[in-house]
Amino acid sequence: MDLVLEFCDSYFFDYVYATLLPASLSPKMGGTWQQAMIKEQMVNATRVFGRSLERPLEVYGYAPFMFEVSPHAFGSVLPRYSLLRQSLSLFLVTTVFGWLLYLIVASFSYVFVFDKSVFNHPRYLKNQMSMEIKQGLGAIPYMAVMTVPWFLLELHGYSHLYMGLELNVRGYVRLALEALFFILFTDFGIYLLHRWLHWPAVYKVLHKKHHKWLVCTPFASHAFHPIDGYLQSLPYHLFPMLFPLHKVSYLVLFTFVNVWTVMIHDGEYLSNDPVINGAACHTVHHLYFNYNYGQFTTLWDRLGGSYREPDHELFDSNLKKDKAVWEQQIKEVDEMIKNVEGPADDRVYER
């Protein structure tokens, strides 16, 4: 995350902090503030010195990495290495980029990929897409708050993220293996967490908000309880704390994860692949609840006995919107709702 933060600091935050909280305010802010800042500088300097004995400087905010430092970088009472500034900046970056990525990818999917016959499905909710967007946009800032501590750990050198790379076959193979391991590790972690979220007591408190959508639009991808979304993101943050991962790969994979999350909610069933947990598998999960908990592959569902092969009608452009097929889905869906949520269904359907 240091690459993103340095870019944002260089082109935006340095100027903003220097303008709103200039260094000239320091004498006016009292001894307590100055003592706190001096203490933080001493603690950070000690930490940097201690680590520099064993490995290169990894604590963000003391030395530039990619960009030239402008005068604004030293013009605020909150320098780049300030935990308060880093926390605020990371929250803003995570929230704004989260919103943009969600809206751009989901909108692209809606226009170019999404099968709009879903709107005619008997279990499509009244005003569903607007509710999905409202829920998604509302969840992202809360998720950002909970995610900031992980990014702070990365900024202060507590992860295994690295930047150098051998520009040869060995280096590229390493990147590929890291990405593959990332997918397998996070897929397993999400499988366990997702299955736990379906325990009745947990489901009703956290995960039910996401299962409000029985048939989905791309905007359902991030429409969940913020704690639910945060918990399912934990494997992505835990991985670089345990295993090496290139910093650029980290950013690419995080972007891919968000794109993939939209794709499995787009209702376009391109392939009935026995390995990939695509949109068809995830549609089965939303319709029938207790199957296909995985995010990327069917591996852990197969091993855990929770895999359900998508109905062949989903892959036929005519049959998947056939009224008889929908009626059969409704029977099983309604029975599953009673078993999982109880006899009262608080959803308001379009039809």
Curated annotation (Swiss-Prot):
Its main location: endoplasmic reticulum. May contribute to the regulation of ergosterol biosynthesis. One of its GO terms (biological process) is sterol biosynthetic process. It is a multi-pass membrane protein. Pathway: Steroid metabolism; ergosterol biosynthesis; ergosterol from zymosterol: step 3/5. The gene is ERG3. It is found in: Endoplasmic reticulum membrane. Its cofactor is Fe cation. The chain crosses the membrane at residues 88-108, 136-156, 173-193, 237-257. Pfam families: FA_hydroxylase (PF04116). This is Delta(7)-sterol 5(6)-desaturase. A motif (Histidine box-1) lies at residues 194-198. Belongs to the sterol desaturase family. Residues 180-305 form the Fatty acid hydroxylase domain. The histidine box domains may contain the active site and/or be involved in metal ion binding. Its EC number is 1.14.19.20. Keywords: Endoplasmic reticulum, Iron, Lipid biosynthesis, Lipid metabolism, Membrane, Oxidoreductase, Steroid biosynthesis, Steroid metabolism, Sterol biosynthesis, Sterol metabolism, Transmembrane, Transmembrane helix. GO terms for cellular component: endoplasmic reticulum lumen; endoplasmic reticulum membrane; membrane. A motif (Histidine box-3) lies at residues 282-286.
